[in-house]
Amino acid sequence: MRSAISLSLLLVFLSRVQSDIVLTQPEADTGKPEGSLRLTCKTSGFSLGSYYMTWVRQVPGQGLEWLVSYHSSSYQYYAPEIKDRFTASKDTSNNIFALDMKSLKTEDTAMYYCAR
């Protein structure tokens, strides 16, 4: 039986209530162990290039785990446990904040959230 890594994604709205600012993610995606996967977060209502963006994840029944905060290629900070496997990036022309993941492990199974 082939095992899979389930990565669920949700819409994440900013903590500040501003109806014109939205972060949108696909509902769910699945990767295979040792495989790779790209998560995307479409942004609107603000200039993506002007802000730090963050990826966090949550394993069911546990708290949020910070993964990366990213402003630009010069200003990016990664959690040590994912530093060599995950890479964040911004496509400011298309307003997309992405997380490229490689060498997936079963412990990467979680809900992934982007946030500003």
Swiss-Prot record:
Region listing for Framework-3, in residue ranges: 85-116
Cited Pfam families: V-set (PF07686)
GO cellular component: extracellular region; immunoglobulin complex
Lineage summary: Eukaryota, Metazoa, Chordata, Craniata, Vertebrata
InterPro entries per UniProt: Ig-like_dom, Ig-like_dom_sf, Ig-like_fold, Ig_V-set, IgHV
UniProt name for this protein: Ig heavy chain V region
Key words of the record: Adaptive immunity, Disulfide bond, Immunity, Immunoglobulin, Signal
Region (Framework-1): 20-49
Keyword Transmembrane on entry: no
Chain positions covered by the region annotation Framework-2: 55-68
Highest taxon, organism lineage: Eukaryota
GO biological process annotation, one example: adaptive immune response
Segments of this protein annotated with the region Complementarity-determining-2: 69-84
Segment forming the signal sequence: 1-19
UniProt keyword Transferase present: no
Annotated region described as Complementarity-determining-1, given as residue ranges: 50-54
Disulfide bonding pattern of the chain: 41-114
